[in-house]
Amino acid sequence: MKVLILACLVALALARELEELNVPGEIVESLSSSEESITHINKKIEKFQSEEQQQMEDELQDKIHPFAQTQSLVYPFPGPIPKSLPQNIPPLTQTPVVVPPFLQPEIMGVSKVKEAMAPKHKEMPFPKYPVEPFTESQSLTLTDVENLHLPLPLLQSWMHQPPQPLPPTVMFPPQSVLSLSQSKVLPVPQKAVPYPQRDMPIQAFLLYQEPVLGPVRGPFPIIV
């Protein structure tokens, strides 16, 4: 009897242990099934979100397309556009475009810089010496003396006066011109003219004078 009771007790204990072992297995199965359901639900949620996003994009494209169609070119005539132009149309004359030669600001700036860097050399002018016009001395010729018809005493007093040479004009030529003029000057032949005496008549004095064809350019002193 004791053996049977012990066997029953052992069997009960084993049965309890088996039940305890079966409970975690069910829990594991339930957990695994719950995880699968969670993943399935997540997949459904993602699919739903992707469908919503795709629907929103389609709606935006539908809104953009009619706006682009309204902006398209509208031709006034319903017929097709001819690809080739008719031959009767004369060719268009192209008017030549005239560009004024304006300097660009960059080029102007470069030219100004060049002028500032390399200034032009100013040539010094040669000094101009004052040149006085040559004054011809108004000398009386034989015809002038005859045409004067002066009285005899006045003419004698004028004849007795010794000739006074005029003061020479003051010139300041360069040294080179002065040297050339001095080297090329020829000696003037001096003729001895007899000085008229007081008792000599005018007609005798006029015989000694040579006829002068033109005005004398320079006063020459009379050498006695």
Swiss-Prot record:
The protein's matches in InterPro entries, at most eight in alphabetical order, are given as:
Casein (IPR001588), Casein_beta (IPR016345), Casein_CS (IPR031305)
**Which UniProt keywords are listed?**
Milk protein, Phosphoprotein, Secreted, Signal
Chief localisation class: secreted
For this record, the Gene Ontology CC terms, alphabetical, are: extracellular space
Record Pfam families: Casein (PF00363)
Q: Does the keyword Secreted apply?
A: yes
Main role?
Important role in determination of the surface properties of the casein micelles.
Q: Which family does it belong to?
A: Belongs to the beta-casein family.
* Matching PANTHER family: BETA CASEIN, BETA-CASEIN
Please give the name of this protein.
Answer: Beta-casein
Q: Tell me the organism.
A: Bubalus bubalis (Domestic water buffalo)
Gene designation: CSN2
